[in-house]
Amino acid sequence: MIWPWLISSSLLAAASLSAATVTGSVALVDSQQASVRAKDFSGVVVWLEPANGALTIPRTATRAQMLQKKKRFVPHILAVLAGTTVEFPNHDPIFHNAFSNFDGKVFDIGLYAPGTSRSVRLDRPGVVRVFCNIHPTMSALIAVLPTPYFAVSRGDGQFQIPHVPPGDYVLRVVHERATAAVLQALSTRLTVQESTTTVPSISISESGYLPVLHKNKYGKEYPKTVDESFYPGAKK
């Protein structure tokens, strides 16, 4: 008897022998962000889905990290394969409480101390917006994807997706300051050849975007000021 996972692994290994690298660049336009006006085009998630919808991916446990450091989530934008467990280590001298009540995954990992970590498994594709229940300025985005063929753009807008088997795909993008209509219009079919395939430059408009207003995990407004002396572990 030949086990199905052996067949799948063999096919993946064979595909990797002729796999290509997909490269390209993004540019952000119509932006009110100072960083974008300074030509910082980082944080755009680009991925490929097989045009025929058929995709076999290995059922291996994968993990990723989103740090909490200097009252920020690092990285601010994270892309992972569906089924990935994301760790949220607390590298600050104060407590944090990461949570999400948007789209891809609703979770609340609770209040936890400096130097500790908690995790959540993101098991279905979607966009997960992450916040802290204590610090209203902390936010991040996790793109949970149905495919292992993805990349996040660098500051210069360049991206590179390695190990893509030749074939027909649909290229999709997610950017935290673009509307759903803009992102949908950017979806395009792409034929990947062996070796390197270069995607035409992708221009993403931020016009029409409205900042996501969020409340705390209880659905209430954050206090106007937060005195961190109330939280164990805070520096006095």
Task: Give the label of every model feature segment.
Residues 19-236:
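Extracytoplasmic copper-binding redox domains, predominantly the cupredoxin/blue-copper superfamily
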